[in-house]
């Protein structure tokens, strides 16, 4: 009886040719696993293609709701970003995929897990660190680090040689990652920084200049930091993301052209479409500015950056990530209320906030006197606050 390998399978170029390659070079029984995080593929086609390519079995795991509730809601509450711009669409999906791969490997008593990540990317780290955190014994096969195929063009040639159908041509080659949260585009002519990215690559977003000529007003209601209602309508978590992707996309919201510092040491360029995430972060940020006290608000920004880096670097299964989640959850206890946004041709303008937990007080913040604040108190405060500067000036050095 042949030993088994569980393959993270998408039906794309890399994983399509890995099936025959594993059988040819390792003589393994290949079990394909497609983790459905909302990439929008025809799963019946993916199943058929995996079997035709030589897999003995194919699992399709629909984890969209788990992805939103256990991963993306953490992103929203923390407002995690990598290097201030990247909304971590790929990074948040990988630990969930790694979790499912390990579960099925245990179920099938597989000795190996295989992935199609390149030897230059971050995903190889995310997958393998995620797998090892759950099963330190299972062995990893990473074809891109060991086979003779050195480019995507080589991969296409190999696919033709072994008779695997691949929906990519040499004329237009982008590496695309899609899920509920985002679409990323890398490779091809994007690797030359002198090239402006082409708007015809977009899947989710209408180019801003071609978006609607009338503004769209949008209301998002949050409960303890998590979105619950869109325009007054209660929706399930997956439908919330889908609806906001549609609304944001048709208004040209959510395009980012980013140069990022990869974990493995090089810089890379990616074009990202994240309409729902962009809307949710903007609304959540506005609500937090009203409901969090100054020091919690400021410290959370530091923690959010650290959280983004942890997730980007594949360190999901760590005590620090769990501790940050606990801190973030504490900060979200009063982040409840409705934020109205005005959307127009790629721009987002927060219009209003309605929350019973507002720390903003119109009476205190106005220019008039109030019982809690007297203009006369400011003089003593300024004297004490400026005392270090005054002493330094008196010392004259």
From Swiss-Prot:
Q: Which biological pathway?
A: Amino-acid biosynthesis; L-arginine biosynthesis; L-arginine from L-ornithine and carbamoyl phosphate: step 2/3
Q: Name one GO molecular function term.
A: ATP binding
Its EC top class is: ligase
Q: Name one Pfam family in it.
A: Arginosuc_synth
Q: List residues binding L-aspartate.
A: 118, 122-123
For the biological process aspect of GO, one term held by this record is:
L-arginine biosynthetic process
The Swiss-Prot or TrEMBL record describes its family as follows:
Belongs to the argininosuccinate synthase family. Type 1 subfamily.
| Location(s) in or outside the cell | Cytoplasm
Q: Which residues bind L-citrulline?
A: 86, 91, 122, 126, 175, 184, 260, 272
Provide the gene name from the record. Answer: argG
Task: Please indicate if the UniProt record lists Ligase as a keyword.
Answer: yes
**What name does the UniProt record give this protein?**
Argininosuccinate synthase
Assembly, in brief, is: Homotetramer.
Q: Give the EC number.
A: 6.3.4.5
CDD domains named among the record's database cross-references? ASS
GO cellular component terms, A-Z = cytoplasm
Looking up InterPro entries in the UniProt record yields: Arginosuc_syn_C, Arginosuc_syn_N, Arginosuc_synth, Arginosuc_synth_CS, Arginosuc_synth_type_1_subfam, AS_cat/multimer_dom_body, Rossmann-like_a/b/a_fold
State the species of origin.
Clostridium botulinum (strain Kyoto / Type A2)
Binding positions for ATP per the UniProt entry: 8-16, 116
Keywords attached to this Swiss-Prot or TrEMBL record, sorted alphabetically, are: Amino-acid biosynthesis, Arginine biosynthesis, ATP-binding, Cytoplasm, Ligase, Nucleotide-binding
Catalytic activity annotated for this protein? L-citrulline + L-aspartate + ATP = 2-(N(omega)-L-arginino)succinate + AMP + diphosphate + H(+)
């Amino acid at each position: 009886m042949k030993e088994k390998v569980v393959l993270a399978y998408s039906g794309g170029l890399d994983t399509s040719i890995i099936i025959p390659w594993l059988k040819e070079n390792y003589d393994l029984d290949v079990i394909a696993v497609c983790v459905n995080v909302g990439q929008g593929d025809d799963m019946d086609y993916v199943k058929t293609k995996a079997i035709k390519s030589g897999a003995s079995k194919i699992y399709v795991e629909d984890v969209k709701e788990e992805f939103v509730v256990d991963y993306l809601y953490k992103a929203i509450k923390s407002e995690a970003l990598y290097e201030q711009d990247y909304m971590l669409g790929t990074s948040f999906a990988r630990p969930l995929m790694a979790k499912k791969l390990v579960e099925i490997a245990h179920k099938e008593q597989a000795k190996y897990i295989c992935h199609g990540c390149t030897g230059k990317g971050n995903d190889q780290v995310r997958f393998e660190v995620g797998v090892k955190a759950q099963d330190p014994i299972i062995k990893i096969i990473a074809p891109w680090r060991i086979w003779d195929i050195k480019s995507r063009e080589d991969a296409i040639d190999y696919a033709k040689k072994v008779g695997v159908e691949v929906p990519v041509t040499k004329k237009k080659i982008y590496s695309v990652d899609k899920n509920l949260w985002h679409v990323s585009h890398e490779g091809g002519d994007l690797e030359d920084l002198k090239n402006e990215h082409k708007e015809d690559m977009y899947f989710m977003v209408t180019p801003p200049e071609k978006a609607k000529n009338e503004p769209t007003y949008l209301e998002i209601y949050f409960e303890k930091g998590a979105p619950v209602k869109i325009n007054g309508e209660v929706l399930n978590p997956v439908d919330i993301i889908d609806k906001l992707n549609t609304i944001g996309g048709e208004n040209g919201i959510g395009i980012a052209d980013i140069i990022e510092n990869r974990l493995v040491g090089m810089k890379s360029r990616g074009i990202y479409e994240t309409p729902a995430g962009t809307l949710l972060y903007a609304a959540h940020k506005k609500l937090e500015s009203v409901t969090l006290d100054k020091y919690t608000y400021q410290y959370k920004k530091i923690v959010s950056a650290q959280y983004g880096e942890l997730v980007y670097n594949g360190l999901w299964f760590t005590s620090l990530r769990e501790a940050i989640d606990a801190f973030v959850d504490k900060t979200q206890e009063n982040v409840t209320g409705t934020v109205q946004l005005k959307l127009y041709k790629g721009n987002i303008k927060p219009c209003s906030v309605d929350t019973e937990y507002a720390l903003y007080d119109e009476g205190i913040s106005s220019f008039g006197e109030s019982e809690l604040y007297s203009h006369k108190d400011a003089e003593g405060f300024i004297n004490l606050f400026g005392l270090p500067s005054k002493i330094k000036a008196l010392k004259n050095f």
